[in-house]
């Protein structure tokens, strides 16, 4: 799937995002599984998953460049190739990143395809890819750290969030299967515990992105930086789990995170969510800190709708109405459809991009699909 398109769908770059082969594969297969068994949706999902099979690094053994899903169906995450981040049109390698998010998005695509097609190879590939991702979190030798751990060891919330969401999707499509020695539900518990104990700072009213090894706040630009949209996405992952389990404690945790990060992120002057903030309200070094990106608003629409559904509290109805109205007024393109991705603080368009290596059919359709299910 191409994602680098201009406002009217004109192709801007034929390079392909491996993230979006997984994300789009999951989205279209999920629509097929939950909304309508439209053969076109399954065809798109199949195309994305077939392409994913070609996006791994070469491996030095007799099986050569065999499809990733075939390898995973036998190896269960052990000694399997790492997926690229970007590839050329024909899947030739371009860029490999240090982290393993391509693998997590591949896992959810394989899981949704397993449910749609009942092909066991996809079931096993989904389990194997999640195992690869979990190994990257738990074994520090697997993923290169962003900063030298000898000088400043840190931990990030991102892998725990994505592990939680990935385990939720595998459980939804495959059942509560065992992955790397634990059930999906047990991994979800582990992720929520890490987020609650290490990253949520109630005394500061924030969910941190990066902390020290013992959960301490480190007083530097990169480690003081908050991402309200990311934190609000985490909040609804937890609220989603609370709804499945009818768990009041999890619901409170999700609501607490949503409440404090909404306060941190919502722009009282122009509306919309700031991209970055500082834990101590100091200046942020990234020059795009006050811009409005499409995806945090999609996550906030889900989070506020879910909070309203779970509690009936009119506060969340007002928050939902505010972010929904602002988003559809400023991001939506009434002529060509879809959403623009990047706005200045006051809501003016930064450019006309509809898609890129980072923006594709995931956050917006997931928001529309999830809210329609509530």
Where are these regions (language model features)?
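Glycan-recognition and catalytic cores of secretory/periplasmic carbohydrate-active enzymes
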Residues: 1-374
């Amino acid at each position: 799937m191409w994602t680098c398109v201009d406002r009217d769908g004109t192709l801007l770059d034929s390079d392909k995002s491996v993230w979006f082969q997984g994300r789009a594969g999951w989205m279209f297969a999920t629509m097929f599984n939950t909304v309508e068994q439209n053969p076109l949706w399954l065809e798109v999902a199949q195309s994305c998953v077939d392409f994913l099979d070609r996006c791994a690094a070469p491996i030095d053994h007799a099986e050569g460049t065999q499809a990733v899903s075939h390898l995973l169906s036998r190896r269960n995450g052990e000694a399997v190739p790492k997926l690229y981040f970007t590839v050329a049109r024909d899947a030739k390698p371009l860029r490999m990143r240090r982290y393993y998010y391509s693998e997590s998005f591949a896992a959810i695509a394989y899981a949704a395809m397993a449910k749609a097609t009942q092909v066991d190879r996809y079931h096993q590939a989904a389990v194997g890819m999640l195992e690869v991702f979990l190994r990257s979190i738990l074994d520090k030798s697997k993923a290169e750290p962003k900063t030298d751990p000898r000088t400043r060891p840190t931990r990030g919330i991102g892998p725990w969030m994505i592990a939680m969401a990935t385990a939720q999707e595998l459980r939804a499509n495959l059942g509560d299967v065992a992955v790397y020695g634990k059930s999906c539900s047990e991994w979800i518990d582990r992720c929520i515990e890490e987020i609650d104990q290490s990253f949520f700072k109630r005394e500061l009213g924030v969910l941190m992105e990066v902390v020290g090894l013992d959960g301490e706040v480190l007083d530097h630009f990169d480690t003081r930086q908050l991402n309200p949209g990311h934190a609000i996405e985490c909040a609804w992952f937890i609220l989603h789990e609370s709804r499945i389990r009818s768990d009041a404690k999890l619901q409170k945790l999700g609501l607490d995170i949503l409440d404090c990060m909404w306060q941190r992120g919502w722009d009282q002057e122009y509306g919309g969510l700031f991209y970055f903030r500082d834990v101590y309200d100091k200046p942020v070094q990234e020059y795009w800190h006050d811009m409005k990106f499409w995806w945090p608003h999609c996550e906030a629409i889900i989070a506020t709708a879910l909070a309203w559904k779970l509690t009936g509290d009119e506060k969340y109805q007002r928050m939902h109405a505010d972010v929904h109205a602002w988003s559809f007024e400023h991001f939506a393109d009434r002529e060509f459809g879809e959403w623009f991705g990047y706005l200045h603080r006051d809501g003016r368009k930064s450019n006309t991009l509809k898609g890129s290596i980072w923006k594709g059919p995931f956050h917006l359709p997931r928001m529309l699909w999830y809210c329609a299910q509530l």
